[in-house]
Amino acid sequence: MTADSLFQHSPEKPPAWLLGQLELLVRRRASGRAGHALIVTSDDIEEASLFCHLLASQEFCAGVPDASACGQCANCRAFSQGVHGDFFVIRRSEGKVFIGIDQIRQATQALQQTPLYGSIKVVLIEAADQMTLPAANSLLKMLEEPPGNSLLLLTTAAIWHLPPTVRSRCQRLSLSPPTAEQAQHWLQAGRGMDAEAARRALQLSDGKAISAFTLEREGSLSMLQALVQSFDQADLSLGPPAIWSKVSVPYLLEGLLLWVESRSRGTVQDGHAVDANWLRLHLCLGELSDRVKRGATPAQDILVAEVYRLYRNCGHKSFERTCSRFLASLGEVNLSG
């Protein structure tokens, strides 16, 4: 589920923890104190995308200016149905590793045309850190010479992966995460999940409320739960758990990273040595994940075997040396990204 479809469920009701920042931004834009380009950052990339959809809906709404769109005017109806002609979403195409230059060029051409519904056009680039360098360079032209009355929104959970030239030409907004109570309440009262399902979804998504709901709606919770259970039981198996080869490499690494973070926070045995090894494992997995996100294409069977070997050796005293050798050899398994 993307933020497009999530938004359609209740476009007029922003989550409570986002409302303050949304209201402030709406006032800044109404007073002319906000620029034409904004980077929205959040650890929960789905939250950043939803926030941008909420902002765009307010920009298009023909009702009374407010942080919440009226939901009744022609603009609001078109937007909530996903058919608004002045709203363009750019995201990585299915089967692709990056957002390409052609996608950015298409958005630029669309912005140069006269708005169909009102006076503004909005482009949203989801997970903008996934742009290729040529795509980012093409985006610079749009940032330096914005066509007409337009608003460019970028979302990211890794702003440091965006080129400095892009970051310097955009205003930034870092979203505040919900408290545990806010996240639980939103999933139950706002999305109709029962208490146990909401608790489990938040636990599996590391407390990210919007991603938790997305996982539940996509039916991915059971797969993620099986993956987490495989991490708990991997040290008892004779080889990599079968499920590790059934999920995508990015999904496997992201899930394992979250699990290692949780495990390292809860470690109480053998004090600092064990804690340090969990941190070293996290470093190795994080480097793997970053390289895959940057376009590395390792053979899944080799990567799974290497990750399993790291995991099994995490408790050894020589693990620091193992990690050093692993990081030094990444290029040998097509992970030079």
Task: Locate predicted features.
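Conserved Walker B
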Residues: 127-131, 159
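Structural motif
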Residues: 122-124, 153
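AAA+/P-loop NTPase substrate/partner-engagement loops
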Residues: 69-99, 160
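Short loop/turn elements that form and flank the Walker-type P-loop nucleotide-binding site
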Residues: 33-34, 80-84, 116-119, 146-149
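Conserved alpha-helical scaffold flanking the Walker A/P-loop in AAA+ ATPase domains
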Residues: 23-29, 98-122, 130, 134-142
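Flexible beta-alpha connector loops of hexameric P-loop NTPases
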Residues: 94-101, 128, 172-173
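Charged, glycine-rich active-site and insertion segments that engage polyanionic ligands
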Residues: 1-61, 66, 75-78, 148-150, ...
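Conserved catalytic/switch belt of AAA+ P-loop NTPases
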Residues: 137-154
